[in-house]
């Protein structure tokens, strides 16, 4: 273990990864990616937007995130060793990684407590998928400028004029009504091609992208420019 090896080399950096952590009632339990997704509430968060039951992320997301987090921890330990001359034992769990990954946005609603706090859906709920004539696209409007740009791009004058939706605060406060209304008005875009839809939103600086298929990625110009493939 670490203690024996550290006696041989005090500069040793040693990473231990577990499912649930070294202590506590779940310590030592076997864990796989879907198990951690469930225990960390990730599957509950994933199902929030549609208002349905828990839903797993269709990826081994926690295996990969834990590996990335471990690499970052080792890099930090290497930096610390340059200052102190000593190594350390890094204890990392998949569960801690999952909670830390979700908390900045998904955890906001349970961090602030009390009757005076206005609880809102996570910011990711502002994202929208839209079905078009030849595929799908995604867009997201957070700022009032982006919302105004969306309305100009798609001629959504009535939506923009509605006082329930004119500011980010009012759109968040009326999240369900906004989502329902937006889904309704977006029906008129179904005859648009993906390229036409994106061109309209790009012209107004509204963040948007086409929905890709895995088999398309190796020929994607942006990924080729990034030298991913």
Language model segments and positions:
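Aromatic-enriched alpha-helical interface/lid elements that frame and gate functional surfaces
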Residues: 126-204, 208
């Amino acid at each position: 273990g670490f203690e024996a090896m550290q006696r041989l080399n005090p500069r040793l950096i040693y990473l231990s990864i577990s499912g649930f952590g070294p202590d506590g009632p779940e310590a030592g339990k076997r864990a796989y990616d879907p198990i951690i997704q469930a225990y960390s509430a990730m599957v509950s968060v994933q199902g929030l937007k549609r208002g349905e039951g828990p839903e797993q992320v269709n990826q081994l997301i926690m295996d990969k995130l834990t590996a990335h987090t471990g690499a970052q921890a080792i890099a930090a330990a290497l930096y610390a060793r340059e200052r102190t001359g000593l190594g350390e034992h890094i204890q990392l769990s998949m569960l801690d990684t999952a909670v830390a990954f979700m908390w900045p946005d998904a955890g906001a609603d349970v961090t602030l407590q009390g009757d005076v706090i206005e609880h809102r859906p996570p910011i990711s709920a502002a994202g929208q998928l839209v079905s078009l004539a030849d595929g799908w696209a995604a867009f997201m409007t957070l700022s009032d400028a982006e919302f105004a740009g969306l309305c100009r791009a798609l001629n959504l004058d009535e939506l923009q004029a509605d006082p329930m939706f004119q500011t980010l605060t009012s759109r968040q406060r009326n999240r369900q009504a906004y989502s329902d209304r937006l889904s309704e008005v977006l029906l008129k875009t179904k005859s648009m091609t993906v390229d036409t839809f994106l061109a309209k939103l790009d012209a107004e600086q509204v963040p948007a992208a086409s929905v890709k298929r895995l088999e398309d990625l190796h020929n994607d110009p942006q990924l080729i420019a990034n030298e991913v493939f």
